[in-house]
Amino acid sequence: MLSIRPKWVEKIASGEKTIEVRKTRPKLKTPFKAYLYVTAGNLSYRCPNGMICHCNGGRAVIGEFVCNKVDWITQIGFSGSPVPSRYSICSHSNMSVLPINDLLYAARLTYPELVDYLAGGEGYGWHISGLRIYDAPRKLSEFTGLRDTRFGAAPYGIKRAPQSWCYVEAMEEEETK
């Protein structure tokens, strides 16, 4: 479950924003399901199906998507070089390096915004596919969180929104319709 500010949720719900940049990522193989929790604030947005949705006060889960790919964002440069390092997309599998321009466009971020957010660290671009906006927002209490323990994942009742994201049990399909 991802906590996202209303202005970004509007862009995701409209299909304008197709990548969400985060400092961390789940230890899951892609594809995986992610739920969209909108933080405090009023939200009116046009869903992909054309209807206008309202979420007054925020603080609700408004939809879900499948993350089918996660890009690794890191700084590339040469130690001691007068040329400053720049953020790029790197592949763990073949160590190829790609320019970050397309990711920034899909995430609706500028390069300075990315630099400010990552503050010299690494990041991850979560690709959004199969977006589904619910007819009615869902309460946080309807979801079960999963906490990592030395014995495996332990379920717990979610009482407050995650700072960035948290693991949750997937809801059954008939429950999300």
Regions found by a protein language model. Name each.
Residues M1-K177:
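Structured alpha/beta reader/binder surfaces that contact nucleic acids or chromatin modification marks
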